[in-house]
Amino acid sequence: MFRDMGPLPSHQEEALVQITAAYLRDALPRGEYLAWVAEDKAMPPIIIGGAGVQLRSILPRPRPGEDDLELGPEAIVLNVYVEPTWRRRGVGEALMRAILDALAARGIRRIVLHASGDGRRLYERLGFVATNEMRLTPR
């Protein structure tokens, strides 16, 4: 996935794997990170896509146009990836619909993501809208 997004320096690959594995060993059992995979049912089955959600606590806030406050965690959709040969075949949409259903079942009403150019149309079809979010990456 990260190679497809741009250059991943070879010296960072092993560290990325190790640190991510350590994070997931801690976050998955606590329910802080939720994960989905899509499989090809060939024998043996192979993973053809995946996606994750990180839950984070945020302060209560007003909901524009609503009478109640927005409470509870915010879901950040991360690492949505489909193997290139499986793209444009509904795998990404199936992953996202599974995520949205699971989050709705948990009562999570605020979901954010950072859309790639390739994924933007899918997210818009699912009801996501562009916002005014900005980012600073201090050096």
For each feature predicted by the language model, list its residue ranges.
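Helix-loop element at the rim of GNAT/NAT acetyltransferase active sites that forms part
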Residues: 1-11
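Conserved acetyl-CoA pyrophosphate-binding loop and the N-cap/start of the following alpha-helix
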Residues: 86, 90-98
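Conserved catalytic-core motifs of GNAT/GCN5-like acyltransferases
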Residues: 58-64, 112-118, 124, 129-139
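Conserved acyl-donor/pantetheine-binding loop and adjacent beta-alpha core of acyl/acetyltransferases
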Residues: 43-79, 87
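Active-site rim helix/loop that mediates acceptor-substrate recognition in acyltransferases
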Residues: 12-41, 58
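Conserved GNAT acetyl-CoA-binding A-motif
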Residues: 96, 103-115
